[in-house]
Amino acid sequence: MQIHTSKPAKTVRGEITVPGDKSISHRSIMLGSLARGITTVKGFLRGEDNLATLNAFRAMGIIVHDDGETLKIEGNGLHGLGEPADVLDCGNSGTSMRLMTGLLSGQRFFSVLTGDQYLRKRPMKRVLEPLNLMGATVFGRAGGDKAPLAIVGTSLKGIAYQSPVSSAQVKSAILLAGMYADGETQVTEPHLSRDHSERILRYFGADIETYSGGTRIRGGRELEGREIIVPGDISSAAFFMVAALIVPGSELLIKGVGVNPTRTGIIDILQAMGGDITLQNCRESSGEPVADILVKSSRLKGIEVGGDLVPRAIDEFPVICVAASLAEGKTVIRDAKELRVKETDRIKAMAFNLQKAGVAVVETENGMDVTGMEKLEGCTAESFGDHRIAMSMLIAGLAARDQITVNDTECIGTSFPNFTALLQGVTVI
């Protein structure tokens, strides 16, 4: 078991670039494989989750050249994938499994998706139900709710689907299946989730349109290979944003970060807490907004977080909880029940770890109440096999009275392989 320790910091200073966006990296491989011609991808995140997607498409006959800096994908068109000779292993990646389930439902072959012990516990029925309405044939354990998933490719028909959850993975699975469906497919959701799929589908030339409350796509249109420059992942930048806010005397510039408005809930929340965060050098790249983020240490205050802010910051809540634990007053988080079905139950995991660090935390069904304190206590924290829990508690250690040790940190490699090295480079102990 790998263990990491974080010690109290004097300051966090410097300029950094975080690895490429995880969501965009997944989608670049998928659409580059389905497009006609060559797609080049710069800034691809070489984390375990994204490599699982890359390996899956190689197993379906896609040729990908990798020189260490740029991927060159030889796309075979919408119907150019080949039947895999073995089970496709998604590792810990829910994005890989859910999006590929939609994409593979419209193929002309049989495939099976599996994952690690954590992914095999995560709910899949939320994806299978709309796909079944489109005519897909997908089987899974627990009545279709758990992987492994067996997919018998078949003809699909367009549907109008009102999703009960605001989930980019559910929405994206339906849209990818919609590329193969007869007619038009529409998806609406309670609150707008991240829209990377819509943007990249449009960038590759899909017949897709977004409107107030939803998205529609018409099947059958071929995609064309493109050049993609993947921006830095705001979910990875979030750890360093919080680090600079909670350690007095800190100032940090994070360069080239994707600031898609469906992902900037973390910035809105931290600014509402009193965080000194400014965007500089705003520009656009490959259909996505990008900026440099300047963060200065700040006295934070507790706030209420809920509603449409939640899906815009869904992956950042573990480190938001760390910020809340060091804010003046109480932070109330609601409407975040989705956190209970991530890589682990993130509400329970963060409550457990912050309580060990001396923080007053009360769990609710769909969130938590966190009462801030001036300094956290040193402790031994558990990652529960979740990369974001592990990294959040290592950030917490920077503002503790004594060191915080985190058990089982191998999981950090799923999204941020150089996290600890980058953190050490900007932290003065």
Swiss-Prot record:
InterPro entries recorded: Enolpyruvate_Tfrase_dom, Enolpyruvate_Tfrase_sf, EPSP_synthase, EPSP_synthase_CS, RNA3'P_cycl/enolpyr_Trfase_a/b
Q: Does the keyword Amino-acid biosynthesis apply?
A: yes
Gene3D superfamilies annotated for this entry?
A: Enolpyruvate transferase domain
- Which pathway is this protein engaged in? Metabolic intermediate biosynthesis; chorismate biosynthesis; chorismate from D-erythrose 4-phosphate and phosphoenolpyruvate: step 6/7
**Enzyme Commission number(s):** 2.5.1.19
Check the record and name the SUPFAM superfamilies matching this protein: EPT/RTPC-like (SSF55205)
The protein's annotated catalytic reaction(s) are:
3-phosphoshikimate + phosphoenolpyruvate = 5-O-(1-carboxyvinyl)-3-phosphoshikimate + phosphate
Q: Which GO terms describe its cellular component?
A: cytoplasm
Please give the biological process terms from Gene Ontology that the record holds.
Answer: amino acid biosynthetic process; aromatic amino acid family biosynthetic process; chorismate biosynthetic process
Provide the binding site for phosphoenolpyruvate.
Answer: K22, G94, R122, Q169, R346, R388
Q: Where does the source fall among the domains of life?
A: Bacteria
Where primarily located? cytoplasm
Where's the active site on this chain?
A: D315 (proton acceptor)
Where does this protein reside within or beyond the cell?
A: Cytoplasm
Q: Which residues bind 3-phosphoshikimate?
A: K22, S23, R27, S167, Q169, D315, K342
Q: Write down the PANTHER family for this protein, in alphabetical order.
A: AROM/DEHYDROQUINATE SYNTHASE, PENTAFUNCTIONAL AROM POLYPEPTIDE
Q: How does the annotation summarize its subunit structure?
A: Monomer.
**What is the designated name of this protein?**
3-phosphoshikimate 1-carboxyvinyltransferase
Which species expresses this protein natively?
Geotalea daltonii (strain DSM 22248 / JCM 15807 / FRC-32)
Gene responsible for this protein: aroA
